[in-house]
């Protein structure tokens, strides 16, 4: 199943490297081989979703790198 999410927070070093941009919409999907939810960045590279809490998808390194919320189907 594919879900579309909007970036609500992107850590400065990630934004500088153009991985994700706040306010843009990205695709989240479940990868059977990796057995994990993945998110595609600006260049189509898949990132592991590190954490899902309160309806938010998070990517972590040593700190929170990015946060996303689900986009309504009508958008």
PLM regions: where:
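SH3-family beta-barrel domains
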Residues: 1-13, 64-75
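Basic/aromatic-rich interaction segments and small domains that mediate binding to polyanionic partners
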Residues: 6-59
